[in-house]
Amino acid sequence: MPDPKLTVSLLKPEEAEQYMRIRHEVFRPTVNKILYARGEPSQETLDKVTEDIRDGITNKGILYVKCVDTSTGEMIAGARWRYVKPKEDGAKERTWEEVDAGLTVPPPYEESDPEMFAELFNLFNSNKREILGRRPYYVLDTLVTLPQHGRRGAGSMLVRWGCEKADEAGVEAFLEASPMGAPMYARHGFQPVKTVELDLRRWSGEDKMEFILMLRPAKQQT
């Protein structure tokens, strides 16, 4: 059972830096090796990440969600959800133009290896296109919990938040899981569809990163 002292709510724009710092700390041994392959990010880069988060909340409808320990007021975990849907009201599916417009590669950071950076996003984008096609869906882009607050149920609460949104809309939910995270997602109804990998040794890295692509079926509307 989740810790009763934990609450989940939408992130406010002024909390973007707190979320960024949690993401940076949690991603340090994994995804940061791709995002910042050439070294620890500068404060300027971290400020840019913070501004991108703030802009996503304010202008792009991205659903950043936080988990707070009410006994201390500390933000201990966060998630980034998006609802990918047709622009036209009443449309059941997106156009292929809408699909491709949403599958972009953001600009790399100063500390990125541009080719490795693009390869990750192209890997994820091509598989979203293949697996989801033109269908609407919720996607969990990011889930991060501070390691010292693990096993309190924060991650599960943030996943459940998005699953409930997907159920309300009657659409599927999708994510790219690490092998370690996949069992928790499975408990929320996500099913493995495909396993993909990015071999960082192609760019003088040390690791091969594996991702399990998982899909949660749409809840039938009654």
Residue positions per predicted region:
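A short beta-loop-alpha structural element at the N-terminal edge
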Residues: 7-21, 32
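Helix-loop element at the rim of GNAT/NAT acetyltransferase active sites that forms part
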Residues: 21-40, 56
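Active-site rim helix/loop that mediates acceptor-substrate recognition in acyltransferases
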Residues: 38-64, 68-70, 80, 121, ...
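Conserved acyl-donor/pantetheine-binding loop and adjacent beta-alpha core of acyl/acetyltransferases
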Residues: 56, 72-150, 197-209, 221-222
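Short hydrophobic/aromatic beta-strand or adjacent loop that forms the aromatic wall/cage
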Residues: 62-64, 208-214
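Conserved GNAT acetyl-CoA-binding A-motif
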Residues: 136-139, 165-178
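Conserved acetyl-CoA-binding loop-helix of GNAT-fold acetyltransferases
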Residues: 145, 151-164, 187
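Conserved active-site alpha-helix within GNAT-family acetyltransferase domains
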Residues: 156, 168-170, 179-199
